[in-house]
Amino acid sequence: MINYSIIDKYIDRLIDDTTPDKPIWNIENIKHGKAPGWNYIDGCMMTSLYTIYKQTDKKKYIDFIDKFVDYYVFDDGSIRGYALDTYNVDNLNEGRVLFDLYRETGKEKYKKAIDLLYSQVQGQPRTPIGNFWHKKIYPEQVWLDGLYMAQVFYTRYEAEFNGGKNFDDIARQFQNVYDNMYDKQKRLYYHGWDYSKKAFWCNEKGLSKSFWLRSVGWYTVGLVDTIGYMPDSAKEQKAKLVAIFKDTIEGLEQYIDKDKKMFWQVVDQGERRGNYLETSGSAMIAYAMMKGARLGVVDKRYAKVGEEVFNGICKQYLTESDGKLNLGGICLMAGLGPETNRKRDGSFEYYISEPIVENDAKGTGPFVMAYTEIKQL
């Protein structure tokens, strides 16, 4: 039996050791000496902490989130370290917490920042069939992670400020990914799709080579969070997303390691030499399974399956050293290209070559997300 109270202490340590300009969880920035800026990694953590605040009603959580985000958002709504003209969908993810902060604090600058980010959504370059490019520097490319980064923010804006006028567009972008990036035999999604079929990493269909766990995790979480924010009045669009989500979750279940109850870094390659059980993607799928069961969009038994995956992570990678908890088994980063970085070619060998770290928010954020669902079982 896992002692979940130690996870509360772990979360508190992350908060206590962090300032807005030096978040302890952003290992990638620390490793590369990057200046702090608006990013999806902090966004993932802020969203998780806000959920904990709503569950516990402990003021320290909302105070921390407000102080953290306030540092990045100026009075005119401009955002420290954010450049709209890069059209990078990753930058939309941290915008999710702005909706909550605007409601909690009434600070107009948060609404102005929301509108700034929505202007990116409106101008984001698209493929000919309507999907957002992942970034301006990656023409015609759709990455699974981008559906989480953009569509959840997009859905919240539509639901809260635009009367749901673009719910069709949101559902269509998920449907396009399902139709073009889903391997119906393996029941898994490829990481990337180049509509133009020009990228060095793609095959004749424009697809990358492998099934990278965290990208599948991002997409799955993107689906369930979008479903959660889309109102019941959007009946047709929501039904489309629920059908995709059910097929996705049912397809993933077969890849859970029977002994360790986690997923592998390259999902379908199991114990192939160099492959490893990976924390961030496992936590995301655990979260999606439990949340999907709670929302009633997948069979209730997935609450138990998700709980087992979460407990598998705790047993495998949650350790104590010098009185402090550490969460390991986290892939630091992975991507596709650009042309100047041909190492990032979507191969099995590439995905297992990226650093494995402890306590990075790409793992701790989803871990805390999954924990918020554990607390609702």
Residue ranges of model-derived segments:
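Extended ligand-binding groove/face enriched in aromatic
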Residues: 63, 74-202, 337-344
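Extended ligand-binding clefts on enzyme/binding-domain cores
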Residues: 144-145, 152-268, 275-283, 301-348
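Short, solvent-exposed segments of well-ordered alpha helices
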Residues: 32-36, 85, 137, 141, ...
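CBM-like carbohydrate-recognition segments
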Residues: 2-41, 55, 60-62, 71-89, ...
